[in-house]
Design a protein with these regions (language model features):
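Aromatic-anchored segments of alpha-helical transmembrane domains
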Residues: 35-37, 112-120, 176-186
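N-terminal transmembrane-helix/juxtamembrane module of multi-pass inner/ER membrane proteins
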Residues: 2-80, 123-130
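Alpha-helical transmembrane segments of integral membrane proteins
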Residues: 24-27, 102-110, 169-174, 194-198
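Short hydrophobic alpha-helical membrane-anchoring segments
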Residues: 35-42, 115, 119, 123, ...
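Hydrophobic alpha-helical transmembrane segments of polytopic
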Residues: 83, 87-90, 111, 170-177
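Membrane-embedded catalytic cores of phosphoryl/pyrophosphoryl-handling enzymes
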Residues: 129-220
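Membrane-interface loops
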Residues: 48-50, 87, 92, 96-166
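Hydrophobic, membrane-inserted alpha-helices
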Residues: 12, 68-69, 86-93, 154, ...
């Protein structure tokens, strides 16, 4: 009887977001390749026409102040002003409530370090590619912040919530929020290439961060 119950538990499918270390590094490499590709399109001025076409497709000529204000409120959920304080709260929660000081510190440092990396990249673009007027916003700071923060949460959820239905609801809700904020950014005038570049940087940061943590500490 006990043997049968053990088999039933062991044959249960693992949650999609409960990824092994090698898969996390592989995904990080894929997102890195996508970022390099997008950077190449921006650098050689191939992305401008694509950005304009996507913006014109998603935004009509007439501006709606109420819509703009609503979209700015949505975008605020991915801004540094919202993400950084929230990451500190998550870090405190992981350190005290979950009694995992290393993970709490690691979570906060991951968000802060990639925020610093973004500022360095934007500084590089501003001084090196001034002749590309649309590259000033590449990559999008908000897109990177929201993808990194919510991506880390998505990867951590399966480790803390046992019920798979709740795991899926939370994980896909956060994915939907990432896409919603990205669409809001494009409608407000941020170029598609900048948003996509921020997505790729944030996603590779989340994958590499959790992958390195699991490599060092073996478990969460």
């Amino acid at each position: 009887m006990a043997e049968n119950s053990f088999k039933n538990v062991s044959t249960q499918p693992k949650p999609f977001f409960l990824l092994p270390v090698k898969t996390l590094f592989l995904l990080g490499g894929v997102f890195s390749a996508f970022f390099i590709l997008i950077f190449g399109l921006v650098f050689f001025d191939y992305a401008n026409s694509m950005d304009n076409a996507i913006f014109n497709l998603m935004r009509s000529n007439s501006s709606n102040p109420i819509l703009d204000q609503t979209l700015r409120c949505v975008v605020f959920l991915g801004s540094s002003q919202f993400v950084l304080p929230l990451s500190l709260l998550v870090g405190v929660f992981l350190s005290l409530y979950r009694r995992n000081l290393a993970l709490g510190v690691w979570f906060v440092l991951s968000v802060i370090l990639f925020e610093a990396l973004l500022k360095s990249l934007k500084h590089l673009f501003l001084h090196s590619f001034q002749w590309l007027s649309h590259s000033v916003n590449f990559p999008s700071a908000i897109a990177l912040s929201l993808t990194l923060f919510y991506g880390l949460l998505i990867l951590l959820i399966p480790h803390f919530i046992a019920h798979q239905i709740f795991q899926n609801i939370l994980s896909y809700s956060l994915l939907g929020l990432i896409l919603l904020i990205g669409l809001a950014l494009i409608v407000l005038g941020v170029s598609f290439s900048s948003v996509l570049g921020g997505f790729c940087l944030g996603a590779l940061g989340a994958c590499f961060s959790i992958g390195i943590y699991l490599s060092v500490f073996q478990k969460i």
